[in-house]
Amino acid sequence: MNHPIEKPVLIDKEVVSELRFPEPDVLFNPAARTKRQTEIDRAVYLGNTEHTKVRILFHDNAGLKQIETTIWGATDKRIILKSGMVIPIHRIQEVKI
């Protein structure tokens, strides 16, 4: 991991729209970024075929957050959650299925 051990704050997906996301990517290693994209692609597939919820660990400007929700889609820059909220991919640390 690229961050010191930090306990994530569990939040509701409805508050994602209120969060602020800095520009730098939270992952510096190219292999970690590839793994993150693979996790996102799998989560989108499972979200659309089986409505599977996943745990998303991400960083906003205040620290590490966690939500459990369905990822309905992804662009090259953002994931789209079940509720229509979006999270920038460059701020996602991990997607756990």
Locations of the language-model features?
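Short beta-strand-centered aromatic/proline hotspots
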Residues: Q66-W72
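Short glycine-rich, low-complexity segments
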Residues: M1-G63, V95-I97
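Short, Lys/Arg-rich amphipathic alpha-helical interaction segments
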Residues: W72-I97
